[in-house]
């Protein structure tokens, strides 16, 4: 239990450090890194064939519903399929012991990721870059992306170039040589 808590804290610190570095970096500096996405419990809603405006509105509604019924534990995120970016899950992390029809447990997984600064409309370009990198390095993706919203409209308003998102491509196996 204590080790799991320390691992979670380490992963959160890694995200915060990356966020601070990205604030200081130029918008074009989007290095691909290996990382471990920690296990968590989430309140989830599916979406299908949704455009960006629909996804934004529904994610906001999902967040409000989660806040009304559960104690929130971390940053909002979406999970979309590699072959269909307009379908997937809205995920609001909640306390580990949460229970309910829309609660799902997500296991820890290795990934390659980019801490991206910019507009949400450009996610498909970042997704393609991660897929190309995985293919080039002989990595096997799980088949979905996880977009973790670190800073967005509540922090930066309409300044889309200042939004910060960790865009992750979970990988089935990353060789020790690829870990940085």
Task: Go through the PLM ranges and name each one.
Residues 4-180:
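A solvent-exposed interaction/effector surface
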């Amino acid at each position: 239990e204590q080790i799991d808590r320390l691992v979670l804290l380490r992963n959160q610190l890694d995200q915060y450090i990356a966020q601070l570095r990205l604030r200081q970096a130029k918008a074009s500096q989007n290095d691909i890194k290996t990382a471990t996405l920690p296990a968590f419990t989430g309140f989830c809603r599916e979406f299908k064939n949704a455009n960006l405006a629909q996804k934004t509105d529904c994610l906001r509604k999902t967040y409000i519903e989660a806040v009304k019924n559960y104690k929130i534990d971390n940053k909002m995120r979406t999970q979309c399929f590699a072959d269909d970016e307009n379908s997937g899950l809205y995920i609001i992390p909640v306390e580990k012991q949460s229970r309910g029809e829309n609660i799902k447990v997500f296991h820890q997984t290795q990934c390659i990721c980019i801490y991206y600064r910019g507009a949400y409309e450009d996610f498909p370009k970042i997704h393609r870059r991660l897929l190309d990198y995985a293919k080039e390095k002989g990595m096997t993706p799980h088949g979905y992306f996880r977009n973790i919203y670190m800073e967005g409209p509540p922090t930066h308003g309409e300044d889309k170039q200042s939004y910060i998102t960790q865009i992750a491509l979970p990988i089935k196996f990353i060789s020790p040589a690829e870990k940085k």
